[in-house]
Amino acid sequence: EMAEWKKKGRLKALIVTGCMAQRYQDEIQQEIPEVDAVIGTTGYTEIVPILDEILAEAEASQKEAAVEEPKEKSFVNCCPSIDLLPASLADKRVVTTGGYTAYLKIAEGCNKRCTYCIIPYIRGHYRSFPMEDLLEEARKLAEGGVKELILIAQETTVYGMDCYGRKALPELLTKLCEIEGIEWIRILYCYPEEITDELIAVMKKEKKICHYLDIPIQHSEDTILKRMGRRTNRAELVSLVEKLRKEIPDIVLRTTLITGFPGETEEEFKNMVDFVDSMEFDRLGVFPYSAEEGTKAAEMDGQITDCLLYTSDAADEED
């Protein structure tokens, strides 16, 4: 649709960014000639100069077209190595989440390599942003009126392991709490097996840290968790939830689940439903499994067809 708009002159520039741009950069250039630039997962800090370059070229081409044959349009491919760490955004951030809330990305990439996930292959290994850069970015956001910081990464709880040799999220949180103007700090994407007593203690101590955790567990049954390449089991998940609610009684827990993973049986699905009922999560996101090209799970036996993914819902409607 955007390519059609470009053909009709409704767009001055068409730029494709993100994970799919990183993965299919060559195909995009070949199959969608209207695209002016492809910017990968580590090239986003260059989007403004690239846009300036493209618009300047477009303006020059329009002038040339009036007097001579226009030159062939250039194509910008900005997909640096996925193992590079993008430059600090402290002085370049544009907040698009409203005036009082902003995301603070504390790391790039992931080392977990769950069998269903393509992220490590298009975002690279786990790289923590330097703590001082994050604190500077947070200060700039606070100066701009931001009151709530939402910490994100593919996995927030191992922040610092790659560059400091330790889980430094508790330390980062403590320092963020010292920034004047920041009133709330929310933590997303905490892997269950990486949540430490130190992190729980900091959450209890610091009043600015919301009693809220997003903990993606993906499934409850040990056989499926193992096939997924997850590093925890049902008993450990139950123990963690009980511990969090004991230590922080008013904590709000959110999680995500995948249904229809290759090899999942009806019994395992029902066991997961029972698990969710017993755990009483406050927020829940449920997604049907989707085979991702290039992942181990996509090659597994027992792929479940779309018509079967919703069998239980259909049965409920008939009842």
PLM regions: where:
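Short acidic, glycine/proline-enriched helix-loop-strand junctions
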Residues: 301-306
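A short, hydrophobic C-terminal helix/tail in secreted or cell-surface proteins
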Residues: 313-319
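Proteins enriched for Cys/Gly/acidic motifs involved in redox and nucleic-acid/cofactor modification
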Residues: 1-159, 198, 209, 213, ...
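Conserved SAM/AdoMet-binding glycine-rich loop
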Residues: 14, 23, 143-266
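Anionic-ligand binding region
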Residues: 298
